[in-house]
Regions:
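GIY-YIG nuclease catalytic motif and its immediate N-terminal context
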Residues: 1-58, 62-82, 86-90, 94-97
Length: 97
């Protein structure tokens, strides 16, 4: 994975079965590594391997949890649109929210 990205992020993982998992963390690199090692959320443990497909940096924990909840409410198509836009922007987490 890329160099450690510290600060609060909301992220999406694509699981082996094609499903998407949304989460929030204050250490993106470490959290994705834990998911990949089977030490993340119960949901991802049974769906390895996982791939980071979206991440956005947010201001603080409160913003991260709000954004995570909003992402989890999106339809699959809306989540995939986030992934496409993120890749088009060069996969850089940007401060927001």
């Amino acid at each position: 994975m890329a160099p450690a990205r510290r600060g609060w992020h909301v992220y999406l993982l694509r699981c082996q079965d094609g499903t998407l998992y949304a989460g929030a963390t204050n250490d993106l690199t470490a959290r994705v590594d834990r998911h990949a090692a089977g030490q993340g959320a119960r949901y991802t443990r049974s769906r390895l391997p996982v791939e980071l497909v979206f991440a956005v940096r947010v201001r603080n924990r409160s913003a991260a949890l709000r954004r995570e909840a909003a992402v989890k409410k999106l339809t699959r198509a809306e989540k995939l649109a986030l992934v496409v836009r993120w890749r088009e922007k060069g996969a850089a987490g940007t401060p927001s929210g």
